[in-house]
């Protein structure tokens, strides 16, 4: 697979009037909802084994988490998702540290410890450099595992300069070229670049998303990246006052490029949907969001029926909206309720 373009030399755009970076809401992320969940937002993305392990972990019973990680093996997207979710448990750092003391060579323990410290750093409770050090240690223990690099990319996406984002993404992609979460993090950051006077439909994040989708295998969920890029760019435009807070009134999805992308991604989903992919609900929600905003209720209705109760905070929360209300409103409109 040829390398993606370097995309170096651009400065970053602020994401809201304060200049703060938006949190990583590429799924059910605690920080996006003050740590609260309800039946609408399932942090596990319908992963029953993860849900069981997470519940046991929160109750101080840790063997289920150890067994879960052992059996996940080198399914890298699933491993990254499961470790990220376990790392958000309140006592994950302490338990992972104890596990490492008992098994100093455990790659699972090291990865959990690293990602747990990353989560603390993202919440402002940990020195980011110390979190980076634990990720580097975990990467040495498992050189082929992209998960420690996922932790580094989560830090870079929110706290680091763009060159750190690009360099970390390159290392992660070398280990797993189709890493779903990594591509979403990269697009979220690159969507924050200024447009440089280019036309609204011509931002470079769209170019990158289409290139990555084209280079991936035909059945890869990365086919939906162009739709994700449009949502991330809308987030930036709305946060900086350059687009209406109501995405359906923004016209953001009405241009010829957006219409072509929506049609292609919906057609891809009809042919290639993967029921087993650990982050499939993120793609479903992005597609439903885009089709709703583009005024295509019949196609959106198909997605909403497929989503069922598995809504994800992003992109419904974009433009600082209540994601629950936004999801319910769009679903009711599409289904005619």
Where are these regions (language model features)?
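Extended, charged low-complexity segments
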Residues: 277-337
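Inter-helical turn/loop segments and adjacent helix faces that build the functional surface
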Residues: 159, 189-200
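Alpha-helical repeat scaffolds
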Residues: 65-68, 92-103, 127-137, 162-176, ...
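Extended non-membrane alpha-helical scaffolds
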Residues: 44, 149-159, 163
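Extreme N-terminal leader/anchor segments
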Residues: 1-92, 301-307, 321-337
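Amphipathic alpha-helical repeat scaffolds of TPR domains
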Residues: 67-84, 104-121, 143-154, 175-192, ...
